[in-house]
Amino acid sequence: MRLRTLVCLSLVGGACALAATGFPRRIGLTASQADVSLPGDLLLPGANVVVDRGIAIDAPASVVWDVLGHVFEPADEATIIEIADEDHVLMHVAAPAAPEDAPASGTCVIALLPLSPSRTLLHIRERHEAHGRERALVWAGVAAESLSSLSMLRDL
């Protein structure tokens, strides 16, 4: 009985600690950085699944933009809503873990925010509007994709 209680309390404590970091809502960003308004936020004002990912890069925005141009290629050019050089790319995206033929009903922005002349914050925000069971599935997909998102950001 004591071992079971210890395990349960450890799991609850771990879950609380994880939730306190903002996971899975945000990774690599402070709460104030995640609260910044980004392009595309008004395209889906009723979004109830909002996920922010970020990493500070020791390079100016122009260099980061060039690297993104070499490694980033959307699967379908029609999903791109707007491109502002050295600032952001805004696109339509399907919900995480959605079937391949699912409509791109959400938005995703990849924004470059200068922290200093030689340091840039790469901020990725994904927004979806989902209800009921679908919302739970989207959050499950977000949580499952979080580790790969973090790995991708670190590889940049």
Where are these predicted regions, by residue range?
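N-terminal Lys/Arg-rich, disordered targeting/topogenic segments
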Residues: 1-2
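Hydrophobic transmembrane signal anchors and adjacent membrane-proximal interface regions, especially
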Residues: 9, 81-83, 152
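Hydrophobic/aromatic beta-strand elements that line small-molecule binding cavities or substrate pockets
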Residues: 53-55, 78-82, 106-115
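A generic structural signal for short, solvent-exposed coil/turn residues
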Residues: 21, 45-49, 83, 102-104, ...
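Short strand-connecting beta-turns/loops that link adjacent beta-strands
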Residues: 60, 86, 115-118
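Hydrophobic ligand-binding cavity/cleft-lining segments
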Residues: 5-79
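Beta-strand/loop substructures that line and gate deep hydrophobic ligand-binding cavities in soluble
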Residues: 33, 93-156
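Short, hydrophobic/aromatic-rich segments at coil-to-beta transitions
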Residues: 83-92
